[in-house]
Amino acid sequence: MLNIGFGNRVAAHRVVAIVTPNTSPMKRLKDEAKKAGRLVDATCGRKTRAILVMDSNHVILSAIQADTLAQRYAAVKEKKEEGTHNEPE
């Protein structure tokens, strides 16, 4: 599970992209997801600092910086890989 802030978590294996919300394409993506009912706002009223795109086409807004989420994502993936490669010594 990937912590996206304020007690909210998402399944890390379902994350397709972690992007910054400042660009026009990301603003359009957010607006289209809202119209389609696929937008999840996990900012708790704070400024959106990252957008997560999921494999189900859901778009999740987070108040945590995209770089921070990317580091957390990498740590989760690394921890998972260590757990799956337990070879006897």
UniProtKB/Swiss-Prot annotation:
Domain of life: Bacteria
InterPro entries, sorted: RemA-like (IPR007169)
Pfam families: RemA-like (PF04025)
Entry-linked PANTHER family: REGULATORY PROTEIN SSL2874-RELATED, REGULATORY PROTEIN TM_1690-RELATED
NCBIfam families linked to this entry: PRK04323.1 (NF003315)
Family under the similarity heading: Belongs to the RemA family.
Protein name, as recorded: Putative regulatory protein Dalk_1931
Organism of provenance: Desulfatibacillum aliphaticivorans
Lineage start: Bacteria, Pseudomonadati, Thermodesulfobacteriota, Desulfobacteria, Desulfobacterales
